[in-house]
Amino acid sequence: MSQSVKRTAADKPLAPCPICGKPARTETKPFCSPRCADIDLGRWLGERYVIPGPEEDEMSYPPHSNDGNRSR
């Protein structure tokens, strides 16, 4: 008798790490290590990655006064 092997999501190979290209690990998915995850986070925090949004017209903001008085 032949035994059939059921494949699960855990058996599916993960995509390569987006930072270094090594195979990703489940524990740090989609990265291969905490180091690569930290590199990616640093890039987001350093604004090297951005998500584009709609252009904003300068006229859509209220006028700004530089006279030093604050309205309360």
From Swiss-Prot:
Binds 1 zinc ion. Its cofactor is Zn(2+). It comes from the Bacteria. One of its GO terms (biological process) is regulation of DNA-templated transcription. InterPro entries: DNA_gyrase_inhibitor_YacG, Znf_NHR/GATA. GO terms for molecular function: DNA topoisomerase type II (double strand cut, ATP-hydrolyzing) inhibitor activity; zinc ion binding. The keyword Zinc applies. Keywords: Metal-binding, Zinc. It holds the Pfam family YacG. The keyword Metal-binding applies. Signal peptide: none annotated. Residues 52-72 are annotated as: Disordered. Zn(2+) binds at C17, C20, C32, C36. Belongs to the DNA gyrase inhibitor YacG family. Interacts with GyrB. Inhibits all the catalytic activities of DNA gyrase by preventing its interaction with DNA. Acts by binding directly to the C-terminal domain of GyrB, which probably disrupts DNA binding by the gyrase. This is DNA gyrase inhibitor YacG.
